[in-house]
A protein has these predicted regions:
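Catalytic alpha-helical scaffold of carbohydrate-active enzymes acting on polysaccharides/glycoconjugates
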Residues: 1-110
């Protein structure tokens, strides 16, 4: 069981808002630092990713998973829950899980 978690969505939020990836390398450097520190400490964590990251930035999601960490689902597009009907929320979650599972090739549990 992981007791440490991170929300990883900066790549997607920037792309969604600006349609560019200007800060990609900066975000990647921060993620590399986090993953390296976790390795040094012998810790594993759950990284919650929006489903769209599995579609637009699969290399980021795969990197986290390949370093032995769990990928968790943090919705598909980070839409406010109070802006969705229950059916829309269910569909959003299903689509997000599908995107992430296709990306990493295994079940998303969180």
């Amino acid at each position: 069981m992981n007791l440490l978690s991170f929300d990883i969505e900066e790549w997607y939020i920037e792309y969604l808002c600006t349609r560019n990836n200007d800060k990609y390398k900066e975000y990647q450097r921060y993620l590399d630092t986090i993953l390296d520190k976790l390795d040094i400490c012998g810790l594993k964590a759950t990284f919650f990713c929006v489903g769209e990251m599995g579609k637009f930035f699969p290399e980021v999601v795969r990197q986290i998973q390949e370093r032995g960490h769990e990928i968790g689902c943090h919705s598909n597009k980070h839409t406010w829950l109070n802006k969705m009907t229950p059916d829309e929320c269910k569909d959003d979650t299903r689509y997000a899980v599908d995107n992430l599972e296709q990306c990493i090739g295994k079940k998303v549990k969180s």
